[in-house]
Structures are given as structure tokens and as C-alpha cells.
Design a protein with these regions (language model features):
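A short, polar/charged loop-to-alpha-helix boundary motif
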Residues: 44-57
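Short beta-strand scaffold segments in enzyme catalytic cores
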Residues: 26-35
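Immediate flanking context of iron-sulfur cluster ligation sites
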Residues: 69-81
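Non-catalytic interface/targeting segments
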Residues: 9, 32-33, 48, 129
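Short, flexible loop/turn motifs enriched in small residues
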Residues: 21-25
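Zinc-dependent deaminase
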Residues: 1-18, 82, 88-150
Length: 150
């Protein structure tokens, strides 16, 4: 797993799209075991006034209704460590691996993923860190809301 994987590139593109829209710059892509991008998306909470439309949920939604077997063996690429909600979605659908762009800004459910037998890979990507740093500096209140803090 590396920064050159098509799934990670798609996730970063989605994060940039979210940033360009004025939203939380987090992107994700769900990739099948054979390397096909099943779905990709970005955090749309601000753009759609949504309580739940985080990047991973957006990627799952954009993948559409799939048979359970499609998720097994799949990899979720995400630009930031997944929150508890997105961690739960990965566990529920039986995703095999979660590849994280960075986890310095926020550490979500990585340990829980590991406990549930899901491989976790952290890339510490500078672009992901820069996008989050800029967003948090410009919109600290929106960031705190996104992660459920006051």
C-alpha cells in the first residue's frame, strides 16, 4: 500500500474537491480486491447540511448497493483516520484493509479496526496533513462540529 495506489490517489482527489467546495477536506475510495474503484467520495457535511455524510460514508453510498461479498477483500482508502461512525461502517461491511493518509490531525477507531481483524496502514501523507491544517486554521468551529466536539 502506497501513495501511488489508484485508490489513495482518488481519495486525495476527493479531499481536494471537498476543500475546493469549502467543505471538510477528507476523501475516501473503496477499492475491490482486484483493484477496481467501487466508490469514491468526500466529506459533504457542510455542503449538504448532513449529520453523517463523512468521506467514507460518501464512498460507500456512491458504490451503491453491492452484494456482501464485494466488500470482503476490499480496501477503504481515506485521507484521515476514520471516526467511530466510519470505523463501524468498515467493520459492518467486512472491509479487509483501511489505508489512512494521515493520523496526526485526528486518530479515530484504528485500534478497534485492528481488534476486529482489519489491517490498518498509515501513510503519513503531507498533502493530507496540509489540507487538514489549512481547514482547521480557517474553520475551527466546523472542524470541531465534524468530530463531535464543542
Amino acid at each position: 500500500m502506497s501513495e501511488r495506489d489508484a485508490g489513495f490517489i482518488a481519495a486525495v482527489e476527493e479531499a481536494q474537491k471537498g476543500s475546493n467546495e469549502g467543505g471538510v477536506p477528507i476523501g475516501a475510495a473503496l477499492v475491490s480486491a482486484d483493484g477496481k474503484i467501487l466508490g469514491r467520495g468526500h466529506n459533504m457535511r457542510l455542503q449538504k447540511d448532513s449529520a453523517t455524510l463523512h468521506a467514507e460514508i460518501s464512498a460507500l453510498e456512491n458504490a451503491g448497493r453491492l452484494p456482501a461479498a464485494a466488500y470482503r477483500g476490499a480496501t477503504m482508502y481515506t485521507t484521515l483516520s476514520p471516526c467511530d461512525m466510519c470505523t463501524g461502517a468498515c467493520v459492518m461491511y467486512g472491509v479487509k484493509r483501511v489505508v489512512i493518509g494521515e493520523n496526526k490531525t485526528f486518530v479515530g477507531g484504528e485500534e478497534y479496526l485492528k481488534q476486529r481483524g482489519i489491517e490498518v496502514v498509515v501513510l503519513e501523507n503531507e498533502k493530507c496533513k496540509e489540507l487538514m491544517k489549512k481547514f482547521i486554521e480557517e474553520k475551527p468551529g466546523d472542524w470541531n462540529e465534524d468530530i463531535g466536539e464543542d
